[in-house]
């Protein structure tokens, strides 16, 4: 029997990470804690960069934008998940699903682009230190962030609009804790060739493109560091990009891990569990990575809490 084609659907069902009732309180507490830590940590980074004039530099300007993107990124998925657990409902409206998917794609792409921009900033700082302030002027920094927003927004809108053209069947269960683009497309009854091509193109543009840029920047950075004669000079140069390199590694490794897990198991629930790493863990860990070894951030936060300028 052929599935019924329904173009006037009103809602989807999010199956979540687990269907076990006894696990729901634990999941609620765990993800609420992770969400609050993520929002608070990234807000502190933004507060530090705004309040301390010494941090009004391109590196911290990009970092504050990344923190804002991380707050928005995690806020597109976790609050709805917590509401569903608390109300014991798995339903999300059609409009809500499309909106969630749109913003998830937007801020996921923005994260990737901002990491590439930050890699370029570190490249200029280490490879062209004498011309750093001239090259990384406020106008260029603003344009780089604006371009990142525009590219991510155009991709998000195009992906979402293509989903709106799809027809869906009676099986509207999404084996995930949020409306993930690939999962939603696979529920469609109509032809998804254009959607699949759009996803692959976007993956190449917003994942492959920034990754190539980051690798090129760091290849130049490594060459410059190797040319430095003193060990102290090498350590100082490397320490300026160590935090960014850690965040990039975390972002890429978790994303690759989710992809490999999905390809190896073909189990949607396993994929959903693995995706927690890049949707929740990465935004949560970023503030800790940037602040633990960053004396400037620590000093700015101490001054903010003490009420000093």
UniProtKB/Swiss-Prot annotation:
Cysteine pairings via disulfide bonds: 97-189
Protein family membership: Belongs to the G-protein coupled receptor 1 family.
A Gene Ontology molecular function term of the record: olfactory receptor activity
Gene name tied to this protein: OR7A17
GO cellular component: a single term: plasma membrane
Membrane topology, Cytoplasmic segments: 47-54, 121-139, 218-237, 293-309
SUPFAM superfamilies with a match to the protein in the record: Family A G protein-coupled receptor-like
InterPro entries (UniProt xref): GPCR_Rhodpsn, GPCR_Rhodpsn_7TM, Olfact_rcpt
Membrane topology: Multi-pass membrane protein
Transmembrane region(s): 26-46, 55-75, 100-120, 140-160, 198-217, 238-258, 272-292
Name of the protein this chain belongs to: Olfactory receptor 7A17
Alphabetical list of CDD domains matching this protein: 7tmA_OR7-like
Residues in the Extracellular compartment per record: 1-25, 76-99, 161-197, 259-271
GO biological process: signal transduction
Role of this protein: Odorant receptor.
Positions annotated as glycosylated: 5
Record key words, sorted: Cell membrane, Disulfide bond, G-protein coupled receptor, Glycoprotein, Membrane, Olfaction, Receptor, Sensory transduction, Transducer, Transmembrane, Transmembrane helix
Entry-linked Gene3D superfamilies: Rhodopsin 7-helix transmembrane proteins (1.20.1070.10)
Protein's cellular compartments: Cell membrane
Top-level taxonomic group: Eukaryota
